A protein has these predicted regions:
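Conserved C-terminal alpha-helix-loop-beta "cap" of PLP-dependent enzymes
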Residues: 74-76, 268-269, 273-341
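PLP-dependent aminotransferase-class I/II
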Residues: 99-144, 151-158
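Hydrophobic beta-strand scaffold residues
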Residues: 102-103, 170-172, 281, 308
């Protein structure tokens, strides 16, 4: 059986594995204070054109979101998110477990707008009972969104302006950052993201690494005693070299972006194949996550031969399904899928 269930079905890119093997017996300090992590940090700083950035490595996306949000908010604050945001619907209440409310606002195709954030803030400010409420202390977005859609450069710039107006840090979840940046429809570079976001992370788990996410604080704004805060969450990896080595390789010779581009090419071919066979798109996603509307009967038939995600109900006879490509998707498996549909 072939699978397009998600974008973390395989292990790691062969070059990442080779770098891990080649450095395996080299002694290195722990907790991220090793020579490999230091080199990876410098490569990322050069790539994002942000020499004053502070970069830290964690293992997974939910862990990263929880650590960043919990560390940057006061105890009485919550984080603003799209109602479809990962922290709101797919993290098992991890943010709430750390003591912070996820304040959801309406989204369109997975995105929140600057005007909606501004409206929420003005409504909050004018509420005479606001001292009895959770204060908004941060804005969380993801790139791409949960529906594979992208913020434009102008949309991100407007969000940045509104966040500055209300002194809200802008935090971008970049679990699939490479897939967003390498999309044909992206008008941004990673340098733009570093410019407009106060903190973001570069996803490795879904893009070529065994595991790992690189947190980037762009405005000399790393929380105080951040190492200790990471430790509080049980997220401080003793063998920090493991994430450092992987990102060192991913940011050598544009590997991260090249393998991200492959996923987009596979997704575009998939989309064209579905459309040519008469299937409808739920959203016209420009990234590696593709959403289609399939009949219940077709879903039952396909589930016998291919794995994919049933996303949500469309109507009584149809469901929205997601097929995801990745850096490791092969032409062979994609062709098999297109034959099956």
């Amino acid at each position: 059986m072939i699978s397009f269930e998600n974008d973390y079905l395989e292990g790691a890119h062969e070059k990442v594995l080779k770098r891990l093997v080649d450095t395996n017996l080299v002694q290195a300090s722990g907790y991220g204070f090793d020579q490999f992590t230091a080199q990876a940090i410098e490569k990322i700083k050069d790539t994002i054109d942000c020499p004053n950035a502070t970069i830290r490595f964690l293992v997974g996306g939910t862990q990263t979101n929880q650590v960043v949000i919990n560390s940057m908010l006061e105890s009485y604050e919550g984080v603003i998110s799209a109602d479809t945001g990962h922290v709101a619907v797919h993290e098992g209440g991890a943010i709430e477990y750390s003591g912070h409310k996820v304040i959801t606002i309406p989204s369109k195709e997975g995105k929140v707008s600057a005007s909606d954030v501004e409206t929420y803030m003005e409504t909050f400010k004018s509420d005479f009972k606001k001292d009895h409420m959770v204060f908004p202390g941060m804005v969380y977005i993801s790139y791409p969104t949960e529906y594979g859609t992208l913020y434009s450069k102008s949309e991100l710039e407007e969000l940045c302006k509104v966040c500055k107006q209300y002194q809200l840090p802008l935090f971008m979840d970049g679990a699939r950052l490479g897939y967003g940046l390498m999309s044909d429809q992206s008008d941004m570079t990673i340098k733009d993201i570093a410019k407009y976001c106060d903190v973001f992370y570069i996803g490795g788990t879904k893009i070529g690494a065994l595991c790992g996410e690189a947190i980037v604080f762009t405005k000399n704004n790393e929380p105080k005693q951040f190492t200790t805060r990471i430790k509080h969450h049980g997220a401080l990896l003793a063998k920090g070299r493991l994430t450092g080595i992987q990102f060192l390789e991913l940011f050598t010779d544009n590997l991260y972006f090249n393998i991200s581009r492959h996923a987009i090419e596979m997704a575009n071919k998939m989309k064209d194949g579905f459309i040519n066979k008469g299937y409808r798109l739920y959203f016209d996603s420009p990234t590696n996550q593709q959403f289609f509307i399939l009949s219940n009967e077709k879903i039952a038939e396909l589930e016998q031969k291919v794995k994919f995600a049933v996303w949500e109900k469309y109507d009584d006879q149809h469901r929205v399904v997601r097929f995801a490509t990745s850096w490791a998707t092969t032409e062979e498996n994609l062709n098999k899928l297109l034959e099956l549909i």
